[in-house]
Amino acid sequence: MAQAKKKSTAKKKTTSKKRTNSRKKKNDNPIRYVIAILVVVLMVLGVFQLGIIGRLIDSFFNYLFGYSRYLTYILVLLATGFITYSKRIPKTRRTAGSIVLQIALLFVSQLVFHFNSGIKAEREPVLSYVYQSYQHSHFPNFGGGVLGFYLLELSVPLISLFGVCIITILLLCSSVILLTNHQHREVAKVALENIKAWFGSFNEKMSERNQEKQLKREEKARLKEEQKARQNEQPQIKDVSDFTEVPQERDIPIYGHTENESKSQSQPSRKKRVFDAENSSNNIVNHHQADQQEQLTEQTHNSVESENTIEEAGEVTNVSYVVPPLTLLNQPAKQKATSKAEVQRKGQVLENTLKDFGVNAKVTQIKIGPAVTQYEIQPAQGVKVSKIVNLHNDIALALAAKDVRIEAPIPGRSAVGIEVPNEKISLVSLKEVLDEKFPSNNKLEVGLGRDISGDPITVPLNEMPHLLVAGSTGSGKSVCINGIITSILLNAKPHEVKLMLIDPKMVELNVYNGIPHLLIPVVTNPHKAAQALEKIVAEMERRYDLFQHSSTRNIKGYNELIRKQNQELDEKQPELPYIVVIVDELADLMMVAGKEVENAIQRITQMARAAGIHLIVATQRPSVDVITGIIKNNIPSRIAFAVSSQTDSRTIIGTGGAEKLLGKGDMLYVGNGDSSQTRIQGAFLSDQEVQDVVNYVVEQQQANYVKEMEPDAPVDKSEMKSEDALYDEAYLFVVEQQKASTSLLQRQFRIGYNRASRLMDDLERNQVIGPQKGSKPRQVLIDLNNDEV
């Protein structure tokens, strides 16, 4: 019996051992270790954003936990290790502390995000957000993620935002107590000491700020007292526009240039003490400015040498470059104002003239401009506007005016405007136009002149976005172009705006050669000009490729993206500069290479706005063969100077009116989207002022031309004549007929196919005809009126 019991107990022991071993084998399942390793690998990929999977994991955690996701990574790794080796879920005090710390960090991240941005996080689906984050390769600041967002959204209505801040502090303290083995009193003592130290530093900073504010106030008060003292020392300027009153039936309100003129002259009178060369103290200031300019020149020479070693990756920012000051422009001279009594008298004459012809109307307002005076007439009920317009010549006769322009009706008002030339045109300087608007945040802001009311008119080129300037010889077109270029030089640095100047007349724009804003030297050869426009088209297409790869829509968005990347990355990438292309005489280009120029202008005007490329085209021959329908339709902004006929005016601005302008800078401006014209007296700019601005710019930085943008040298046709005796006859025949083909030469000269083909090749090589384009006829590149013909 005893032996049997021993055997049974032995069997029980062996079976129990087998059971425990089998349990151990089951518990030691290798799948658990594989899962743990996989979790660790995924967490490492997410932390360092390695590859596609790493970015997706980090996007997911960023969306859920926001900035607190880094603590989540650590907690997941620790929990994985604990569960793997202890084979149970951790239920300790530190586990609770970690969870409380995670919740506290969610609150902290979301509160920081809320106070910084002042906006709420968007409630996007998780998968769509993760996909967008991966697709754009960026991880935006999302505060406390979706969990933090909903925690804050639920808590604020219950306990207010201030209560949430208190709860967050308590959660942080509780997590520290749970995670550490210190007693509560010790933790509270340390916390109180830290709070006291923080309040002490905060009070010190506030006291320092109050002291700085007090010093600034005292400095402002001192400057105001000095300005008052200077004004008291200054002699009073007598008003030369004191008018003797003429007895009238009633007083008509008069506005405009006389008031603006007095303002613009009272302001510079204070500056005269600073900038006049007559005062000895100002000579010292000028010497000091000259010394500073010499130092700037030395610094910029060094910077230019360093720029030349850099490849054509982009324009290097010259930190020491300073835009030219407005003091380089001449101060506007004081001029005799238009007599108000004379203006009142003409207003009464105008009313009487209209009454004599059966038109009952009253002059309600008079605006005195630099060149013309506008009489605003309000016709009585039932009077047709066309009746006033038909009295155009009678009104001019009654007022003894050269010509009058009638604006019927004035846009946005129930009145008719009659513009009568002044006896003497008041000169408008570019300095007084730019004084109120410069420096401008828009680097393409240019000054045009003053309108009828005497208000300065400045327009941004990037809103035009392209401009057509046309007018007869001597009307002020070239002065307007110089004013636009000078405005850009006064407002933009070389790395911000680039210029390409095309001047077939070879005399107007050569003064700008050597300025650092130029992409290439001023182009004077018409053949090179066509190639230069094609280079601009290629640059436009290159920029659109950059926009496509960077997922941006225009130059503004691309430059903002580059600025953000430059802040985050060590490698600095250059921003794209704006490019302004100015063609001073379009007619000369259309005679030499009409089709190429027209096609290039069409591409630029249709697509280049988003790429930051803007075109200004000027011509003194506003005919339909120069300003073609394609060019006109794609250039929305236009300036019309004085022209000889109403047909030319309609070619430029679509309506008549430019034939009645006075010349000497008198213009009609039609902006992009405007339904009416604005009459402007253009700003005058002397050659010496242009030269002073150019010298100031060139002394700081030399031109750094882009070789890729330079057009190829024109082919020397004297060296590329044909050996065939019939070449000259074929040349004249093709130019006269303005068409060319092998079969046409065969029939005309009764020659074989081979000889006719060789003649066609010679004509193409000498740039008489264009290349073959499939079944289309070849284009003849030489005009019949060409000097060579």
UniProtKB/Swiss-Prot annotation:
Binding annotation for ATP: G474, S475, G476, K477, S478, V479
FtsK domain ranges (all copies): 454-650
Entry's Gene Ontology molecular function annotations: ATP binding; ATP hydrolysis activity; DNA binding
Gene3D superfamilies recorded: 3.30.980.40, P-loop containing nucleotide triphosphate hydrolases, Winged helix-like DNA-binding domain superfamily/Winged helix DNA-binding domain
UniProt topology in membrane: Multi-pass membrane protein
Keyword Repeat set for record: no
Region (Disordered): 1-25, 209-275
Compositionally biased intervals (Basic and acidic residues): 209-231, 247-262
Top-level taxon of the source organism: Bacteria
Subcellular localization: Cell membrane
Alphabetical keyword list: ATP-binding, Cell cycle, Cell division, Cell membrane, Chromosome partition, DNA-binding, Membrane, Nucleotide-binding, Transmembrane, Transmembrane helix
Transmembrane segments: 34-54, 63-83, 99-119, 137-157, 158-178
Primary location class: membrane
Residues on Cytoplasmic side: 179-789
Leader sequence residues: none
Sections of the chain in a coiled coil: none
GO biological process, one term: cell division
One term under GO cellular component: plasma membrane
Family label: Belongs to the FtsK/SpoIIIE/SftA family.
Entry domain remark: Consists of an N-terminal domain, which is sufficient for the localization to the septal ring and is required for cell division, followed by a linker domain, and a C-terminal domain, which forms the translocation motor involved in chromosome segregation. The C-terminal domain can be further subdivided into alpha, beta and gamma subdomains. The alpha and beta subdomains form the DNA pump, and the gamma subdomain is a regulatory subdomain.
Subunit structure: Homohexamer. Forms a ring that surrounds DNA.
Primary role: Essential cell division protein that coordinates cell division and chromosome segregation. The N-terminus is involved in assembly of the cell-division machinery. The C-terminus functions as a DNA motor that moves dsDNA in an ATP-dependent manner towards the dif recombination site, which is located within the replication terminus region. Required for activation of the Xer recombinase, allowing activation of chromosome unlinking by recombination.
Protein name per Swiss-Prot or TrEMBL: DNA translocase FtsK
Gene: ftsK
